[in-house]
């Protein structure tokens, strides 16, 4: 539904690693992925899709009838309060409830298989190493440790592809 809406409104590009289209002065690149934001923000003005959707007056949001969601704020978005606000505003527009976790918003410590701030002593052997480069058993253990904070009966809302893939 969202993709179809955007395709009617504007040209839709794919991943910035593959789609290398040029931008013109005044263009705004809407992004979903934090890596795309980081790639594009020096070339063109950027805005998250969440902010854009939140500002729409004509979008028909679904009614989620009070469904509760844990909100997993991405570590790569810790300095982007506009995204935190837009995601929560969208949940309200859909009649859903955000459950805030301890390390949320600017205090986020997790980005899927990229980053996790934890005091696990096993990480001392891997300084400044992205999680995806760690031994698989250690990655699994760290993901399980992080995910243990969530009640499995309540969905976790992730707006980062890495967080989503790992949770």
Go through each PLM region and give its residues.
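Iron-sulfur cluster-binding electron-transfer modules in prokaryotic oxidoreductases
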Residues: 1-167
């Amino acid at each position: 539904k969202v993709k179809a809406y955007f395709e009617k409104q504007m040209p839709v590009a794919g991943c910035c690693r593959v789609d290398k289209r040029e931008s013109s002065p005044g263009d705004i690149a809407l992004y979903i992925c934090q890596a795309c934001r980081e790639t594009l923000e020096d070339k063109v003005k950027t805005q998250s899709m969440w902010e854009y959707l939140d500002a729409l007056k004509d979008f028909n949001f679904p009614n989620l009838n009070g469904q509760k969601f844990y909100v997993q704020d991405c570590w790569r978005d810790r300095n982007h309060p506009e995204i935190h606000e837009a995601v929560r505003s969208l949940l309200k527009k859909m009649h859903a409830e955000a459950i805030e976790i301890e390390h949320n918003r600017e205090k986020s410590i997790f980005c899927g298989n990229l980053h996790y701030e934890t005091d696990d002593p096993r990480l001392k052997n891997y300084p400044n190493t992205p999680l995806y480069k760690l031994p698989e058993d250690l990655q699994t253990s760290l993901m399980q440790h992080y995910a243990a904070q969530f009640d499995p009966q309540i969905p976790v809302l992730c707006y980062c592809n890495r967080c989503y893939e790992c949770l």
